[in-house]
Amino acid sequence: EFRRVLFRSVAGTVGLMMAKILKVSSKNSLKAAIDLGIAMQLTNIARDVIEDGKRNRSYINSNFESIIKTLKLADSFYESSFKSIKEIPLNSRFGILVARRVYREIGNKILNKKNMDNYKNSGKIYVSNFGKINQTLLSVFDLIKLVFTKQSEHLRKDEHSIINEQINLNERI
């Protein structure tokens, strides 16, 4: 429980700081920023298992099942961040959608490796320039989809009750 709260607080704080920089004030959007920060950090952890192992760092077990589990968790955080992106100021919204898609695509590329041997032999996994262009174009559809998406209660509200005890969403930075 402590590790979970610590991880979510640290990873979520990165998203929260970005939200404050972008002048996001909606509580739902701040929660989405926390979720997006967590999703991106989980993706980094899954991507860097081999590199971290060489440096005697271990955030998850170094087997493909743990990587899959981590990426599925990341995916749930990417999903929960989407609807509240609608409340982010328009001038920042598209960039956030692109970053969300590009990072999520890193996870998809990892999953496409299918097993640990392929993962180990692939080197650093990243999204190519063409892939980034593709994800940018797909983000246009996300932007349009947001116009027709109704704002609803945040998907991970129960988990945020733990985070809310640690982070004051009304605090000024």
Region roles according to the model:
Residues 3-40, 46, 50-173:
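Catalytic cores of Mg2+-dependent Asp-rich isoprenoid enzymes
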